[in-house]
Amino acid sequence: MKEDNNTSEESGRINRRNVLKTVGAAGLFAAGSTGMAAAADSLSQAEEPKLLTGTEKRTLARELAKTPAFRELAQRARADGAQIRSDADSIVAGYARGEDFAREVVQYDLENLTDAAEASIVIGRNPETGEIEVANLDYYYETDDGVLDEVHRFEPTNASETDGVQSAATSDGATVIAVDTDAIREAQNSEIDVDESSPSNAAPTPADIDITGCSACKYAAGQVCTIGCSAAGGFICGLLGITIPVAGLSCLGFVEIVCTVADEYSGCGDAVAKEACNRAGLC
């Protein structure tokens, strides 16, 4: 794992996400089913996910910060020496609704980290029932060459694991989420190969989606880019309800590949989704 100096080494990752903060919301993919369930015929639908701003964002952030789940995770972060950032840009909030799916999620960024590249607390609530459905404290670690290596996740007491793909426990109680570093590095080192023939802006319907195939990958990639890479992977996966592997990767690893390609294209669209899924080996 890479030692973080909180200046130059961290800035590359943060700057990349800031560049994509606004273009992500202008993604060209139509909204539709985005949550991936375990079976091909069972898709959780998160329609028209959107980021909140202004009063809506502040109100939701204050509400979720009062929950026991947030307080427990914040206490854990403070025990690690980290602090919750207080500036407005350090909070990301979003909302998604669909058939049998409704979720509002807030990401609270942390600072004063020891060896992680970045960290955040993510809290997600069902606005209809008030139930907390997502509650994570995630520390993102990178390799010496700046590639996402693994994520150490803490959850509230008695919480169920939400993205435990190839996971293991650490001595401090964190769940280590493997993100397939080699696949991410290969994606970051690949050259853009734009195929401009027969572009299509139409999103597949749930009946068209093969959960393990190219269509599912491109659809998920489009929704990730629509949310935007200013947010951490834990926020994006929580908002969209993606809880199983996409393209054989954990959701966190998949998000990293999509954001790498979106950064190279400086935006979103069919070409980004196609290129990301090509690099993931599904298209």
UniProtKB/Swiss-Prot annotation:
Provide one Gene Ontology biological process annotation: killing of cells of another organism
- What's the domain of life for this entry? Archaea
Q: Name one GO cellular component term.
A: extracellular region
- Explain what the record says happens when changing residue 64 to A: Impaired immunity function of Immunity protein HalI and interaction with Halocin-C8
Please give the record's comment on domains.
The helix-loop-helix (HLH) region is essential for immunity function of Immunity protein HalI and interaction with Halocin-C8.
NCBIfam families given in the database record = halocin_C8_dom
- The name this protein carries in UniProt is Pre-protein-C8
Organism, scientific name: Halobacterium sp. (strain AS7092)
| Phylogenetic lineage | Archaea, Methanobacteriati, Methanobacteriota, Stenosarchaea group, Halobacteria
Task: Tell me the name of the encoding gene.
Answer: proC8
